[in-house]
Design a protein with these regions (language model features):
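Aromatic/hydrophobic pocket-lining residues that form the small-molecule binding cavity
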Residues: 1, 31, 66, 107, ...
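Core AdoMet radical
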Residues: 11-27, 41-68, 73-107, 120-126, ...
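Active-site-adjacent beta->alpha loops and helix N-cap segments on the catalytic face
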Residues: 27-33
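Residue-level structural signal for beta-strand termini and adjacent loop
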Residues: 30, 226, 253-255
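Hydrophobic positions in alpha-helices of CheY-like receiver
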Residues: 34-38, 111-114
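Radical SAM enzyme core and accessory elements
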Residues: 230-259
Length: 259
């Protein structure tokens, strides 16, 4: 891990994101350990990607189970909490994130609580059919983010992995590939959303991997992408440290390995 951090530091990395293939807040002590290890490298921006479900979860005594951890993480340098969503409607988010529950979390209250603890908040909205799939839905999501005082809002369309086979389970057909195939937006839909953002907002920057950052009536908005390979790019998009000690630069391809 130290070697990965040193390489990131030498490469001019400014942002560290704690994330995973599962939900990181299930393992709060692990987050604390990584933040402790990161502290000596003094990266300017440290972020946590989460579904947000445990942020305001209470135990049987009514205590917030992550309150002390969140306060510690903030002291250790965690600056941004990015919450994954598919919409601002609770029922839409419930279908994806808590289908086993009757209700989704109170998202506005979660955002407010994180702000009270001193964190900035990003909503990372995955665009999919039946959810955020049109310019109108994008504008409504932007209005919601502005009303909640969200610092950053990112739109990322569902993208199709290169293979229908899970590389970790060669005998199983990858159900996530099937879901992505059935729910990804068309190129026409994405184009119309980009054109709407160009009309509504001001382009602030275009990142090397193709993401575009806008100011839309005072709201920071990023139209991003995922699972994109740009072999001719002059810089890496990611340096990804895996728990097994390997350092990679792409989530999807096992051949994208540095250490």
């Amino acid at each position: 891990f130290d070697k990965a951090c040193r390489l990131a530091q030498l490469s001019g990395v400014t942002t560290v994101m704690l994330t995973g293939k599962g939900e990181p807040t299930i393992f709060p002590s692990q987050i604390s350990s990584y933040l402790e290890a990161l502290k000596k490298y003094n990266f300017p921006l440290v972020e946590l990607q989460t579904n947000g479900l445990l942020i305001r979860e209470r135990d049987s005594s009514g205590n917030l189970i992550l309150e002390n951890a969140l306060k510690m993480w903030h002291q250790l340098g965690l600056s941004m909490v990015a919450i994954s969503v598919v919409h601002h409607y609770p029922e839409h988010n419930r279908k994806i994130y808590t289908p086993h529950r009757k209700e989704y979390i109170d998202l506005p209250a979660t955002i407010k609580y994180l702000h009270e603890l001193g964190f900035s908040v990003r909503l990372s909205c995955v665009m999919a059919k039946g959810y955020v799939e049109s310019p109108e839905a994008v504008e409504n999501m932007i209005n919601f983010a502005r009303q909640q005082g969200v610092e950053q809002l990112t739109f990322t369309p569902v993208n199709l992995p290169a293979s229908a086979i899970d590389p970790d389970n060669h005998d199983a057909y990858d159900k996530h590939w099937v879901w992505a195939s059935d729910n990804m937006l068309s190129s026409k839909q994405i184009k119309s959303i980009r054109e709407e953002l160009d009309d509504m907002g001001v382009r602030l920057m275009e990142l090397s991997h193709g993401a575009i950052v806008y100011d839309v009536r005072g709201q920071n908005v990023c139209l991003s992408n995922c699972l994109v390979v740009k072999p001719d790019a002059s810089e890496l998009r990611n340096l990804i440290f895996f728990p097994d000690g390997h350092l990679r630069y792409h989530w999807q391809f096992s051949g994208a390995i540095l250490l």
